[in-house]
Structures are given as structure tokens and as C-alpha cells.
């Protein structure tokens, strides 16, 4: 196969914000009909956020769009970058459309990937659904029934409202925080509640 390399951003992933999501999404969408697959290398700190946002900004892609990175730089003797790239290329050659994250022998839907470990090579987990693919000595094994497929046209939507706050509840969360957020004129509050959505209603209610 032929490879084409394009530099989009040179930025520590801790600084990837909604403005950069827009740059990345536009770059992908412009070339989406020119290639059989697109692989994006990305720092691991915010890669799951970017993969998820691109999943919503570019809907119904007909080609694989895969994010990957590494815990150690590619020049390090113990780097995980090479195998992660191999996993990404294996997914790229599958021809299955969608946005994915390839890391430590797992292929995860972009909307399901979360970084849960800071230094381990097994840094990402697939939340509330199994990984859609595994790379091992047998090659790439996909569970295609877990990958959403649509006959709809590929669409691009870059209307991002970044004035939304995520509030993670703890048993000691002070409800006055909500008033502060309203005064700050946030346009949306997402409450990460307990379990399946429980919120305290005694004292701190």
C-alpha cells in the first residue's frame, strides 16, 4: 500500500481544545474521499476526547479513521509506539468505516475510549462495550456487530458549544457550585452522578 503523511498540528496534547478539534476534523473531512483510511497520531493525554469528538463531527464515515499514540516516545528502546501503529494499520486495512482508537492490541470505538492509566501500556479501556477488535498472533479479529454501520451520507458538523461544564459528584459536593456555574453563564451542565444516575437529596441537595 501507499502512504501519504500530512502534518496537521505539532502540539502537546494537553493543549488540544475545541479549536484544535475543528482543525483536525476539517483536515480529515477534506481528504476523506481521497484515501482508503486515515490514521492520526495523537498524544495520549487527550486522545480519547479527540477521538470521541471526531466521532460526532464526522458522522457515517465510509473509511476507517484511527487514532493512536504511545506511552513512550518512538525513539525509546521500550517504546509501545511501533506496535500501536501496527494495530492502527491493521484496522486501516480492514476497510470498516468508523472512528476508532488503536492502543495496546485493542481497537476501541472513538466514543467509548477512556484513558484510565497514566503510565501503563494498557492505558485505554472501552467503556460499557467490549473493544471492537483485538490484535494478536492470529491478526486482527473484529466484532463487526459492535461497529455501527449506516447507509447514510458522510456528514461534517463543526458546531461545538465549548461553554459546557462537567460536574463530577462526590459525597461532599457543595450544591452552591451549581449557582456559581449559572452566574458564570455556562450554557450547559453535565452532572456525572453516582451509579446509574443517583444524586444525593439529603443535606447537600
What does each of the following model-derived ranges do?
Residues 20, 81-84, 202-205:
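Charged helix-capping and loop-helix junction motifs
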Residues 36-37, 188:
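Structural motif
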Residues 43-62, 199-205:
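Short Gly/Thr/Asp-enriched flexible loops that form oxyanion-binding sites at enzyme active sites
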Residues 1-29:
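ATP/NTP phosphate-donor binding region
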Residues 40-42, 66-69, 100-105, 168, ...:
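Short beta-strand segments
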Residues 12-15, 74-75, 196-199:
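Short, small-residue-enriched loops and turns at beta-alpha junctions
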Residues 67-136:
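Internal gly/pro-rich beta-alpha loop/helix module
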Residues 1, 109-196, 201-202:
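Accessory alpha-helical/coil subdomains and C-terminal extensions
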